[in-house]
């Protein structure tokens, strides 16, 4: 997107830019899109903020995909090395003759990012009083995303994340669907809602009384699938609101099937490599596809030299009858006596909204010897698995009691082929709020049984717990009590108190336990420091004392340097905010920037927009932010960088007043006329707060459309500040009209100095009441303006040459700072009385006086008077005794030069212009100029 220099103000937006932001257009990516005719786009461009707003018709913008960003906006992040570490030590002192023991542990996980590649490894060190310390490596692999096929590739040695297979360690590679690259509504099963609207209507979905979807549909049939469920198993309540207010209502039955993905979604896994346990090569393939009519099909294959298996599954939504899934599997393990085995796996789910009840049931039946996965076969070789299971059944019931709480039951029953053993377990639990929601009560009854022939072993445990949160930001936050009783055995009681301090950086917990004349007191806490987290604990009992402690954190190295911090997940962001040292990051607890304004955070959502905000209330007093929130869209495992523009300076409160003493109106727009063009709004009574200001600056104030509703204010911040560290100032005599500004005025002494205006050289034309005329070529420009009675004017700038002109109607003062300028031409058209020019110089070697005369009646005369009380100067042409120079006598120019022995003119002096006329009947007009030459640019 760009402007053509010298052409019209129309700009070019390439098709590629529109496509990147999600507009559905087609065309040559490098060509400019036809905005008006083709797309009917509207645009708005802010030159100062460099912001372009594009307004697009909804028909060119596809429906938002539930937070997933366009692929072209995904950020692979910085090349960086992040290393997390965890060091801990335990020490036990046993009372009596037992020997004390200790152990030491270290876990170091370097993570290297190079472009889209993520290289991961882990090193673990263990040592105790019985063994020497030794290092071990759990994994070393590289991974990357493949956005064009929405997949993820892993290559190396380790445990790889596979959804449809039991995990084991191997050397090889994995290619699988990256579900994070799909929006939730495209991958997760939810029923397609179909209906018909008589008019343009609003369609709303509700689940458990909560609105989860709302959209406008045209007249006719509609089919909606791009919505996100609330996470419950409740039916969908659909409301269609027509234009005339009539409402259609219907219910769509829903239950999460055990095997189900969205129609059209495909999930696959491919794994190949060499197993660590047996050094055998293997292949694993898995494929899941969502089909029409609420069907989902699943198939998987595992193959090795000694093992092979096949699974086929089918899931189906049954509407009001619930959801059913069926999986059939067959395996062949050549190293087992029962090599050919089969299994059937049936799962059923049903939600009953009228009873606030959810049911689930599963049954698995296996042939003699038992079905095995490849992981089972590998464990069998080292004696860690036996193919003995025959049937297993699992059931659960979840029932809501409304304000009385919730009641849940689950049970498992299993039998075996060889020894006729049976195992059963039951769990009944209840939870509710008590004391009007000020405390929580929970309880559970757990029973387990093991039956072998005529023997039966059972165990029953009753647990009851109460938790009372205080909702405090510091100090004691909660008190809890838990008791556990074993039938025919001991009972235990635990009383705990938890709290936090220092803005939740310090967490602590104290627990007192008692069981059968045996007591235990323990204390535990951790502190979230800026660069690491430390933890420690100590417990005392009749048998032993136990002390432990540790430290964990992370070190990030990238091209910008080194950042220390806590270990914060895999997908991360670097924060760079120079000038915002020790500033908190919103939503990240106690994490804050270091002394350079740098930090890192983690646990970002990949492929989605993540907002990262600095807390302005924690900024240093002399800092402010133009924008407090930046957005990043990282890929999985990326370390992206986000930068904040921090302004250093005093926080200033000004009172802006017009020349008549009235305050500048509420809501007036104020622009700080520096390189960043920051804007603010005037508050009540003309008060203006500048979040960050230099000691001096210039403000442009606008409160209306007319020239009498505009002004420019210069200010200097003094030392007057209030208890909050805000400096106080005021602005009197604010004037309309404005020119351009380039540099601060260094010689002003007032805390706030009013000026007529300032001019910036990039403007080509500016006109106001036919009095303003500007011209600009490269670095040179000239201005004519009306000064008026009692007005002051200040002109400064980084340009090389500048010309100024003024109608001196009644004793005006022109204040000129020549500091950055090499040549200045100052001209004055004056009709009567006196004009004064106050100069501030920067190593000026001479000033040349120039004049041209517009004579109306031939009788007018005028002269310069040079005045300075601190030194004597001469003009190179012949002067009269009064140092007056007749204008008619200096047609070739006259120079003001330093006195003998001096190299430059003084830093500040005053030159007074005076004109008189011999006839009062005809107005006279003179043009007087100054050519100032400096040897310093």
From Swiss-Prot:
Keywords: Cell outer membrane, Fimbrium biogenesis, Membrane, RNA suppression of termination, Transmembrane, Transmembrane beta strand, Transport. One of its GO terms (biological process) is pilus assembly. Pfam families: PapC_C, PapC_N, Usher. The keyword Transport applies. The keyword Transport applies. One of its GO terms (cellular component) is cell outer membrane. It is found in: Cell outer membrane. A 97 kDa form of the protein is thought to be due to post-translational processing of isoform 104 kDa. One of its GO terms (molecular function) is fimbrial usher porin activity. It is a multi-pass membrane protein. Suppression of amber codon 754 seems to be amino acid specific; a supE suppressor (usually Gln) permits function, whereas a supF suppressor (Tyr) does not. Belongs to the fimbrial export usher family. These proteins are essential for the biogenesis of mature CS3 pili, but not for synthesis of the CS3 pilin subunit. This is Outer membrane usher protein CS3-2. It comes from Escherichia coli.
């Amino acid at each position: 997107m760009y402007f053509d220099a010298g052409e019209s103000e129309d700009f070019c937006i390439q098709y590629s830019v529109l496509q990147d932001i999600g507009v559905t257009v087609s065309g040559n990516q490098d060509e400019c899109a036809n905005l008006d005719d083709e797309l009917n786009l509207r645009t708005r461009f802010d030159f100062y903020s460099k912001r372009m707003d594009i307004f697009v018709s909804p028909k060119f913008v596809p429906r938002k995909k539930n937070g997933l960003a366009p692929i072209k906006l995904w950020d692979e992040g910085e090349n960086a090395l992040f290393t997390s570490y965890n060091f801990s030590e335990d020490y036990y002192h046993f009372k009596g003759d037992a020997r004390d023991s200790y152990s030491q542990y270290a876990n170091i996980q370097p993570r290297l990012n190079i472009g889209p590649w993520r290289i991961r490894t882990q090193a673990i060190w263990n040592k105790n009083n019985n063994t020497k310390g030794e290092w071990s490596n759990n994994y070393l692999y590289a991974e990357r995303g493949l956005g064009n096929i929405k997949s993820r590739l892993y290559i190396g040695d380790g445990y790889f994340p596979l959804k449809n297979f039991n995990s084991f360690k191997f050397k090889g590679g994995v290619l699988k669907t990256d579900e994070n690259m799909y929006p939730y509504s495209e991958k997760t099963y939810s029923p397609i809602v179909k209906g018909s609207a008589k008019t343009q209507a609003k369609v709303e979905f509700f689940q458990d009384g909560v609105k989860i979807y709302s959209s406008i549909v045209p007249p006719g049939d509609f089919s909606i699938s791009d919505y996100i469920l609330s996470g419950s198993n409740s039916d969908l309540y659909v409301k269609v609101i027509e234009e005339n207010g009539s409402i259609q209502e219907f219910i769509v039955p829903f239950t999460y099937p055990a095997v189900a993905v969205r129609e059209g979604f495909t999930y696959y896994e491919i794994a190949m490599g060499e197993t660590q346990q047996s050094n055998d090569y293997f292949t694993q393939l898995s494929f899941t596809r969502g089909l029409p009519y609420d069907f989902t099909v699943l198939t998987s294959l595992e193959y090795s030299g000694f093992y092979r298996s096949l699974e086929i599954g089918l899931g189906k939504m049954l509407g009001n009858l619930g959801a059913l899934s069926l999986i059939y599997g067959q395996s062949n393990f050549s190293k087992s006596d029962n090599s050919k085995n089969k299994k059937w796996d049936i799962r059923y789910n049903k939600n009953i909204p009228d009873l606030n009840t959810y049911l689930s049931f599963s049954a698995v039946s296996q042939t003699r010897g038992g079905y095995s996965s490849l992981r089972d076969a590998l464990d069998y070789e080292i004696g860690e698995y036996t193919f003995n299971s025959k049937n297993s059944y699992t059931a659960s019931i979840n029932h809501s009691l409304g304000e009385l709480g919730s009641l849940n039951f689950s049970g498992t029953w299993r039998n075996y082929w060889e020894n006729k053993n049976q195992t059963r377990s039951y769990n009944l639990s209840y939870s509710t709020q008590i004391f009007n929601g000020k405390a929580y009560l929970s309880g559970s009854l757990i029973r387990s049984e093991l039956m072998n022939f005529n023997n039966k072993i059972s165990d029953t445990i009753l647990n009851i717990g109460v938790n009372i949160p205080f909702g405090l930001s510091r100090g004691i936050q909660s008190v809890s009590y838990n008791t556990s009783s074993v039938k025919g055995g001991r009972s235990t009681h635990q009383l705990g108190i938890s709290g936090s301090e220092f803005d939740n950086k310090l967490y602590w917990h104290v627990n007192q336990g008692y069981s059968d004349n045996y007591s235990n007191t323990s204390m535990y806490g951790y502190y979230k420091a800026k660069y690491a987290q430390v933890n420690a604990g100590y417990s005392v009992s009749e048998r032993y004392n136990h002390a432990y402690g540790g430290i964990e954190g992370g070190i990030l190295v990238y091209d910008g340097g080194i950042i220390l911090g806590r270990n914060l997940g895999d997908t991360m962001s670097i924060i760079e905010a120079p000038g915002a040292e020790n500033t908190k990051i919103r939503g990240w607890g106690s994490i804050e920037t270091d002394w350079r304004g740098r930090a890192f955070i983690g646990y970002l959502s990949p492929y989605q927009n993540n907002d990262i905000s600095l807390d302005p209330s924690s900024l240093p007093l002399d800092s402010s932010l133009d924008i407090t929130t930046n957005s990043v869209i990282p890929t999985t495992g990326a370390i992206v960088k986000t930068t904040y523009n921090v302004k250093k300076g005093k926080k200033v409160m000004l009172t802006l007043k017009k020349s008549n003493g009235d305050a500048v109106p509420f809501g007036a727009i104020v622009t700080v006329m520096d390189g960043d063009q920051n804007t603010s709004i005037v508050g009540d009574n003309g008060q203006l707060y500048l979040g960050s200001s230099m000691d001096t600056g210039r403000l442009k104030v606008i409160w209306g459309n007319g020239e009498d509703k505009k002004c420019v204010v210069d200010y200097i911040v003094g030392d007057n500040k209030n208890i909050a560290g805000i400096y106080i100032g005021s602005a009197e005599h604010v004037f309309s009209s404005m020119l351009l500004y380039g540099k601060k005025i260094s010689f002003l002494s007032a805390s706030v100095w009013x000026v007529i205006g300032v001019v910036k050289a990039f403007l080509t034309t500016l006109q106001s009441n036919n009095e303003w005329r500007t011209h600009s070529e490269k670095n040179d420009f000239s201005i004519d303006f009306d000064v008026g009675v009692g007005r002051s004017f200040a002109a400064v700038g980084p340009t090389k040459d500048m010309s100024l002109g003024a109608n001196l109607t009644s004793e005006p003062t022109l204040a000129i700072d020549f500091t950055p300028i090499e040549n200045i031409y100052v001209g004055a058209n004056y009709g009567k009385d006196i004009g004064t020019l106050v100069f501030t110089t920067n190593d000026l070697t001479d000033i040349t006086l120039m004049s041209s005369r517009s004579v109306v009646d031939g009788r007018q005369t005028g002269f310069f008077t040079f005045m300075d009380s601190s030194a004597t100067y001469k003009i190179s042409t012949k002067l009269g005794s009064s140092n007056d120079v007749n204008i008619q006598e200096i047609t070739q120019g006259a120079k003001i030069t330093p006195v003998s022995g001096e190299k430059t003119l003084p830093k500040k002096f005053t030159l007074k212009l005076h004109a008189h006329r011999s006839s009062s009947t005809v107005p006279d007009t003179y043009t007087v100029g100054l050519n100032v030459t400096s040897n310093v640019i």
